[in-house]
């Protein structure tokens, strides 16, 4: 099993804005991410051009949601910001925010040693 860690409130700020049905779908996909030996690409994909940033992919009633994350020490999935995707390309602002949050996570981890 993979452990999911929520870094600060970035994920929850996104999650709390969703309807109950969307929250249920997100919970289901997060469960798959924790238990699947190999996470299906339908739910999980590395973002090209990033240093270890992934997106968790959630689709519900024609709407597409993305939640950024990364691995730490092999098994832990750290959840960052999420957003509703409205076009084919991931918005550069959302991607830049995720990279900034990922760097913030690892910077804080280094300081704690």
Question: Where does each model-flagged region fall?
Answer:
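Basic, Lys/Arg-enriched alpha-helical interface segments
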Residues: 1-64, 73-77, 85-113
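ATP-dependent carboxylate-activation loops
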Residues: 80
């Amino acid at each position: 099993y993979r452990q999911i860690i929520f870094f600060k409130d970035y994920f929850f700020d996104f999650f709390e804005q969703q309807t109950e049905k969307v929250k249920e779908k997100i919970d289901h996909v997060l469960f798959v991410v924790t238990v699947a030996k190999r996470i299906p690409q339908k739910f999980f994909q590395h973002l090209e051009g990033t240093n270890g940033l992934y997106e968790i992919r959630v689709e519900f009633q024609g709407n597409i949601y993305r939640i950024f994350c990364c691995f730490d020490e092999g098994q832990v999935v750290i959840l960052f910001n999420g957003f509703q995707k409205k076009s084919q390309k991931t918005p550069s602002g959302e991607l830049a925010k995720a990279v900034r949050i990922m760097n913030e996570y690892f910077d804080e981890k280094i300081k704690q040693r």
